[in-house]
Design a protein with these regions (language model features):
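Conserved P-loop
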Residues: 34-98
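ASCE P-loop NTPase helicase motor core
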Residues: 141, 149-229
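Pre-P-loop entry segment of helicase/translocase ATPase cores
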Residues: 1-33
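ATPase catalytic-site recognition across NTP-hydrolyzing enzymes
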Residues: 215-276
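Conserved small/polar residues in nucleotide/adenosyl-binding loops
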Residues: 278-285
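Residue-level preference for the first positions of well-ordered beta-strands
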Residues: 34-36, 64-66, 119-120, 141, ...
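Inter-Walker segment of RecA-like/P-loop motor cores
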Residues: 81-138
Length: 291
């Protein structure tokens, strides 16, 4: 008699560990409308937001919700899958990918939602026209990854689309950008200041993370990753330290680091000899230098 294989039972937990700093951020998000996780790469920011979003999704009365990234594909990979820790894995056995009124969606219904249908619409947000894909819908909660890569019009439209939500909650994550970026001046830093002045209603939750805050990565691997960077480079400051840097595209890094070393006071210049120090290459000079 052929032996039948029993279906694999759903495991109760997903094997992921959260450090104290991450736990504090997730815990605080329960009481805050806007939640922002910023910092270095591989710091665990996205997993925090996905977990918090899914936890709230179980009890929200709103049916339709939004998940966005720079492109639709990125939204499905980063938020839907998230290396095995995404929304589809949180609701494993209780969800399916499909379409909802023409939109890419994860349709959830099971024990975790009280057998009520909850729909997460996935959308790209990078283009100037991306906002059109979410017009006409009303959303409850919104989770956006790499929010600094979203177009401004999409961000504003997403806010407008959630005004009538029963549980209006938003989660963003991002790697550091130029300090003058609109996402800081118009939203993140503005909210931070308003919260400090007790002017922000609904609760604001901000946390900064680095790879050292991710306890799922071994110390040896962290050391290996750091060793691949020049500690003086903007990439180290941005990717490892999680700092906002405006120097991207800088050609003369040595000059920027120590300009005084290369500056000659005007009082020491012999202006009659300045022109002798300047050589302007002609196209012929450039061509001959290549021969």
């Amino acid at each position: 008699m052929a032996r039948t294989t029993k279906p694999e039972k759903r495991k109760k937990t997903i094997p992921y560990n959260f450090g104290d700093k991450h736990k504090a951020y997730i815990r605080k998000s329960q009481d805050c409308m806007i939640n922002v996780a910023e910092g270095a790469v591989r710091a665990g920011k996205t997993v925090d937001n996905v977990l918090a979003f899914c936890h709230e999704l179980k009890t929200t009365k709103d049916k339709i919700h939004l998940a966005s990234a720079s492109t639709l594909g990125n939204a499905k990979i980063i938020l839907g899958n998230c290396n095995g820790f995404g929304i589809e894995h949180f609701f494993r056995g209780q969800c399916r990918w499909g379409k909802y009124k023409g939109n890419e969606a994860l349709i959830i219904k099971g024990k975790d939602t009280g057998f009520k249908t909850r729909i997460v619409i996935f959308s790209g947000a990078m283009l100037a026209s991306s906002y059109k894909s979410i017009r006409g819908n009303s959303y409850g909660m919104w989770i956006g990854t790499e929010i600094n890569l979203h177009h401004k019009s999409f961000v504003q439209e997403a806010f407008n689309r959630s005004i009538a939500a029963d549980k209006r909650k938003i989660w963003w994550d991002l790697n550091p950008d130029n300090p003058k970026s609109w996402i800081y001046t118009e939203y993140i830093d503005k909210y931070q200041q308003d919260a400090a002045d007790c002017k922000f209603l609904g609760g604001y939750n901000y946390a900064h993370f680095t790879i050292d805050d991710n306890i799922n990565i071994s110390d040896q691997r962290k050391a290996e990753v750091k060793s691949q960077y020049d500690p003086t480079s903007i990439w180290y400051k941005r990717d490892i330290l999680g700092l906002r840097i405006a120097a991207e595209g800088l050609i003369f890094q040595s000059f920027a680091n120590d300009p005084e070393k290369y500056i000659i006071p005007e009082s020491q210049l012999d202006k009659s000899k300045i022109l002798s120090l300047i050589h302007i290459s002609s196209p012929r000079d450039v061509e001959e230098s290549r021969m």
